[in-house]
Amino acid sequence: MTPQHHLPADIERTSLSIITAELDAMGLTPPPETAAVVKRVIHTTADFDYARNLRFTPGAVAAGVAALQGAAPIVTDTNMALSGITKPGLTRLGDTALCYMADPEVAALAKANGTTRAVASMQRAAAEHPGAILAVGNAPTALLTIADLIETAGLRPALVIGVPVGFVNVVESKERLFAVCAAHGVPAIVAMGRKGGSNVAAAICNALVYSAAGMLDPTDRGWK
């Protein structure tokens, strides 16, 4: 097979067509309401397992889109996830994304309380942006903090994206978060199991931003 040069917009369209065809062939066609998120994650990772392990509370995608259209900010647990979120999409929506992990006040709070920056950053996010979209791609402790705040402090974020990757406390934290969100009516998108990562968190955010901003086709995002 001879490699060919393709324009970015054509690459994305062709990739998504391949993803759609392969999902259909495997009997894993996602429901229309979650398809954009599932396909965006597979496009980012080339991993079709996400068609099986991404779980959504009822109406989670619609809640995320509505929140972004209402200017709810996105708060991530890593600067890597933050850097992967589409800036043109956020600009079109008049929206913002932020991460507190490198904030000196968060570092000081974590040290004073003998906890992690991930915990302190989510505590600050809950205090300053209680209606935000919280996107976690790295730290299980961030998910556990969010779950605790939902249960004990009445936190009601617009959406929780829980996709940390790893082997220690990852599966358990995701299961707890999903159960707590489902029990308290908090919209959630969670990658069950060990897989995930900051790139997956950013991909889910981008799928929501593109939908909210009407940028579903690559040319809508300025690609040629």
Regions found by a protein language model. Name each.
Residues A81-G84, T141-I146, F167-V171, G197-A201:
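Short glycine/serine/threonine-rich phosphate/pyrophosphate-binding segments
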Residues R52-A67:
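A short, well-structured juxtamembrane/interface segment
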Residues M1-P31:
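Charged, compositionally biased N-terminal leader segments and the immediate start
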Residues V168-K224:
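C-terminal functional extensions of proteins
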Residues L90-H129:
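Long, charge-dense
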Residues A158-F167:
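ADP-ribose/adenylate-binding Rossmann-like module
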Residues D77, I161-G162, I204:
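Buried hydrophobic positions in well-ordered alpha/beta secondary-structure cores of metabolic enzymes
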